[in-house]
Regions:
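Catalytic cores of DNA base-excision repair glycosylases
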Residues: 3-126
Length: 126
């Protein structure tokens, strides 16, 4: 069984949340197909803020909704750098990312996610 992207990027919360954003309406296999190139070109939130939207869109193209995703990642990264008190304040963060944050960053295993993969993960670790 392959680890969740949240496990892979647990030590880099920004990358973990980027993956959660990309997984929205997208299969893991599709995200796996672009994440290495994405994080090679934009290894930190600071590079992402400076990203050329067209270049970023090209990397994201296989996922669909690539222009919207590019704008979302840039805005999310800008907000990340400028600080936040609750992860839900960040642009592009929905319930899946929030639940992932609670589980993998806050070590809160009492979360009740609606996502079946996160539910299965909690069943295994609890």
């Amino acid at each position: 069984v392959r680890p969740l992207l949240q496990e892979i990027y647990q030590d880099d919360p920004w990358k973990m949340l980027v993956c959660c954003i990309l997984l929205n309406l997208t299969k893991r296999q599709q995200v796996d197909g672009i994440r290495h190139e994405l994080f090679y070109k934009y290894p930190t939130e600071y590079e992402m803020i400076e990203a050329d939207e067209d270049e970023l869109s090209e990397i994201l193209k296989p996922l669909g909704l690539y222009r919207k995703r590019a704008k979302t990642l840039i805005k999310f990264s800008w907000m990340w750098v400028n600080g936040f008190s609750d992860v839900m304040e960040l642009y592009g963060i929905g319930q899946y990312a929030r639940d992932s944050w609670e589980i993998f960053q806050m070590n809160n295993m009492d979360v009740k996610p609606t996502d079946k993969v996160l539910l299965a993960y909690l069943d295994i670790v609890n």
